[in-house]
């Protein structure tokens, strides 16, 4: 399902633990790390899509998390042509996403990367909040910067830590144009 401008409606998930570290998943059979994300199906709300994707990709249920916030608007990124399926070329531009900030209220052991027959990740780890900006694939970096900055205000407001907001990597702020680990442990799916 694409909108009129060629963007696929999608949700992104920033899942944090009690130390405000973020869940960072390694794409299956690739050396690419990213946040959980996925398309919104016809008739689904962004919240419904978020819970479905959370279960499909991370194995968590609604009772394992608490919603802390979400982005106000759609954040968009363009996908380079060489990543676009041949049959979509000429129509598909990229993703437009609503990002959710979730707090894990369950345990690390509740994470199950094999919750479905088609897993997205084969390993995961907790990383410091800003690490993904240095590690994510380049074409997603601006959207990650926008989402992390907007949601950091919610996450860190009690601790007055927003002074550490990261600067945008490239270009002016626009929703239309879009290292180091904390504990050294990656969690491998099994």
Curated annotation (Swiss-Prot):
Top-rank lineage group of the source organism: Bacteria
Extent of motif Nudix box: 38-59
Boundaries of every Nudix hydrolase domain copy: 6-149
Family annotation (InterPro entries): Nudix_hydrolase, NUDIX_hydrolase-like_dom_sf, NUDIX_hydrolase_CS, NUDIX_hydrolase_dom, RppH
Keyword Hydrolase set for record: yes
Gene3D superfamilies listed in its UniProt record: Nucleoside Triphosphate Pyrophosphohydrolase
Enzyme class: hydrolase
GO molecular function: pyrophosphatase activity
Keywords in alphabetical order: Hydrolase
Cofactor(s) recorded in Swiss-Prot or TrEMBL: a divalent metal cation
PROSITE patterns in UniProt: NUDIX, NUDIX_BOX
Signal peptide: none
EC number annotated for this UniProt entry: 3.6.1.-
CDD domains: NUDIX_Ap4A_hydrolase_plant_like (cd03671)
UniProt-annotated stretches for the region Disordered: 167-190
Main function: Accelerates the degradation of transcripts by removing pyrophosphate from the 5'-end of triphosphorylated RNA, leading to a more labile monophosphorylated state that can stimulate subsequent ribonuclease cleavage.
UniProt family annotation: Belongs to the Nudix hydrolase family. RppH subfamily.
This protein's name: RNA pyrophosphohydrolase
Name of the gene encoding the protein in the UniProt record: rppH
